[in-house]
Amino acid sequence: WQSPKVRAEIYDILRFWLDKGVDGFRLDSIPYIAKDTSFPEIDLRKYPDVFPYYSLGPHLHDYLHEMNREVFSRYDCTTVGEGSKTAPEEGWKFIAPERQELDMLYHFGAADIRNETEADDPATGIPYSLLALKRMYAEWDAAVGDGWPTIYLGNHDQPRMVSRFGSDAPEWRDLSAKMLTMFLLTMRGTPYWLAGDELGMTNIRFTRIEEYDDIDTRNHYRKLLREGGDTEQFLREQQEIGRDNARTPYQWDGTLYAGFSTAKPWLRVNPNHTEVNAARELCDPDSVLNFFRRAVTLRKGHPDLVYGSFRLVDADNPQVFAYLREGTGRNYLTVLNFSPKAARFDPKTDLTEAMPLLHNYPAPPIAEKEGPIELRPYEGILYRLA
């Protein structure tokens, strides 16, 4: 990237595809393209986190601004950068409109919290800190300012959304998948989906290393074998966090290979494809897929739900993620129980005149003029406020 000739060639490649009509680009691992070629010495015992030494290097933002000036600004296109490990105070630099670099940046904040935090209260049944998750999204929203955020809970490098942030137990799978759908489609920012999450596809949970295709999983397993590590524990962990959980064939229907192929695919099809598949869900008005479609239609029809501001409500509630979306025409309140247990939520306002627009149970809870409302496990409600 330091070479002007290399950058010019990259810009020619971008123009080639834009001239063919592509709508935009995802820029993978974009914080890492600039390096400090003075190669400073570091003491890994003192600085175990080497991220600052290979990320956000000199002239990174000069390169991105130049790319925008030479290519992106000349086309009707969109750009999104992958920014793993990028903090909010650095993330805004990529997408602030006045800086003219990228349109969007997605971070790994939710994945990191799911992996690295413990339950706020074990009694809630949430295995990570929902309070930390709420703080993280509030911090990013504040840092982005007039820029445009992204929102996602799963991708090709993450386990399935419903298995990770909801529950794939049969009694909760559909409810929690719908609740998470409401979350993604009522937050500020552009929502991103991994194909299959709109069906409620779940982790496959392989039991043998031979079933895995992911090179990271295989390499780590070999390393444990060499060093005498606990390979059984590792395989149990991979059932929850392994990347191949999200890479199984898309479940089009209930046939042998889920309608994905007539030949045996590279990864085993999830056995639940006979229940969780597009053909079946298209015919079921109460399916996760049709709930997703209703939520998308609702979002598109309510501009203030897209562009309105974001503000946490009942921020210290360890079970409920609730927030206001305040716009120029209408205000909305989203209330989401992230727990497999009943929860109480205090809206601090009269909801008796509010209109429930979207709900994942047959009927929403009764709202009183004051006091908390009772939420069922994984219940989600979107209110349009009076």
Mark where each language-model region is.
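Active-site and adjacent substrate-binding regions of carbohydrate-active enzymes
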Residues: 1-386
